Design a protein with these regions (language model features):
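Polar-ligand-bearing catalytic/cofactor-coordination segments
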Residues: 3-330, 350-433
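Loop-to-helix entry region at the N-terminal start of transmembrane alpha-helices
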Residues: 330-340
Length: 433
């Protein structure tokens, strides 16, 4: 392939991605706006019209900010590639550190990633202190915002720099099959991060307290016993320091596996509703969704590293993305190849987005069915309804937008599936007082 042809292909996919995302966003805004004045029937007795309209306005605002975010990302990507930004960074560090190639490559990658983070910072700030604050969700202070970003930068450097150094060394010293060794190291690195996250990384950003004794803990322990699930601990996270949104999740595996509840979730839900939410999360584990996802990610990363192994030896790959290759060079430095690949790859993966979203929604339906079987269907409906309302989730998403992006099924469809379970399991929802 000629470098110019690859440049056109890259720009074409990028423009196609932007146009498609803009079209889907416009559909979402129009659809949500058309349905903002009537609460869907399954929720009419539980969610008020003002709350429904607030969720519609919140959804539209998020979509509009998402458009800005997409354009900022596209501009930064083009600036680093075809407009010569990465080439300039590479040449600058070559001049300053001509005799230290490994440090030079790490600094090239670190500089580019830092610039990307700085470009994303204004949108992130607006999201927290304008959009989320406008709708009453933000509880983060500017000081906490800055602290979070500095901690993320530090953790990223402590984990990322050794990872990148190891990958570069493998690329340079393990022959033509370096990509296989690099993939194996990548898998091992991710396993270590999964082990460290619950007990080392997550506590850097949030406080975790053991779940207090009481009715909630008793119901949860009984549920875990019924489902034959052992956890390394039950914890409450101070999510209210940052947001009014609520959630619950599993993290870690083996002895480090733990169950985490946001304090905002526990403050809002009744005991049986908390049990139903946890039963849903248990469903993901019991149906092996997490294991399947890890295997899928492993296969995908293997294909990605194999593709990188081939592309890194193709001069048109570098030249087509704005990196000059001298007449006596077979390829660019390993660090530049890594960075270019992981910058360009997402542009070509857009067609996989709806497939991944569909797989995730399928898993959500299975987890809901497990929750109905092992807890209480009505409590699950009630809990989900409160979560939709408290998180400002629209009840009327555009079907195509939802199919393309959403990892969870649309609210009416999800509640409808739960209510299709046996009547004795899912009693009718009580009316709103």
């Amino acid at each position: 392939m000629q470098p110019l042809h690859f440049s056109f292909l890259f720009v074409g996919f990028l423009l196609l991605s932007l146009v498609l995302r803009l079209w889907l966003a416009s559909r979402q805004v129009r659809h949500v706006s058309r349905h903002r004045d009537a609460v869907p029937e399954p929720f009419a007795s539980r969610i008020s019209l003002p709350a429904h309209q607030r969720a519609a306005a919140y959804t539209i605002a998020r979509v509009q900010l998402g458009i800005v975010d997409q354009f900022v990302g596209a501009v930064v990507l083009l600036a680093l590639t075809l407009l010569g930004g990465l080439q300039f960074i590479h040449e600058t560090w070559m001049r300053w550190l001509p005799d230290q190639p490994l440090l030079q490559q790490l600094l090239v990658m670190g500089t580019a990633l830092l610039l990307i983070s700085l470009a994303e910072l204004p949108v992130d700030w607006w999201r927290h202190f304008r959009l989320e604050t406008r709708f009453g969700f933000n509880r983060m202070t500017p000081a906490l915002f800055v602290a979070d970003h500095l901690k993320a930068l530090l953790v990223g450097a402590l984990l990322g720099l050794p990872l990148l150094a190891a990958l570069i060394a493998l690329m340079q010293h393990t022959g033509q099959r370096w990509w296989l060794w690099a993939w194996a190291f990548w898998i091992g690195f991710n396993v270590v991060v999964l082990l460290l996250f619950p007990t080392v990384i997550a506590p850097l950003f949030n406080r975790f307290e053991p779940l207090a004794d009481g009715p909630v803990k008793e119901r949860i322990l009984a549920l875990l016993a019924r489902c034959q699930f052992s956890a390394g601990g039950l914890f409450v996270m101070d999510g209210s320091r940052r947001s009014a949104h609520g959630n619950a999740y599993f993290t870690g595996f083996g002895k480090s596996r733990r169950i985490v509840f946001f304090d905002t979730l526990l403050a809002r839900l009744e005991v049986d509703e908390v049990e139903a939410v946890l039963a849903h999360e248990l469903g993901h584990f019991k149906k092996k969704h997490i294991l399947k996802r890890l295997v899928l990610q492993g296969v995908f990363s293997l294909v990605a590293f194999a593709l990188l192994g081939w592309l890194s030896s193709q001069i048109w790959f570098y030249q087509g993305l704005g990196i000059a290759i001298g007449p006596f060079q077979a390829q660019a430095p390993a660090g530049v190849a890594l960075l270019l690949f992981f910058l360009a790859l997402p542009v070509f993966l857009l067609p996989l987005r709806p497939l991944m979203a569909w797989m995730s929604r399928r898993d959500e339906f299975e987890a809901d069915a497990f929750a109905v079987e092992h807890s209480n269907g009505h409590a699950l409906v009630s809990a989900l309804t409160k979560i939709y309302e408290d998180n400002g989730s629209t009840l009327t998403p555009d079907p195509l937008h939802s199919a393309f992006y959403d990892s969870h099924p649309p609210a009416p469809l999800r509640i409808g599936r739960i209510r299709q379970r046996p009547a004795e399991t899912v009693p009718a929802a009580p009316a709103q007082p």
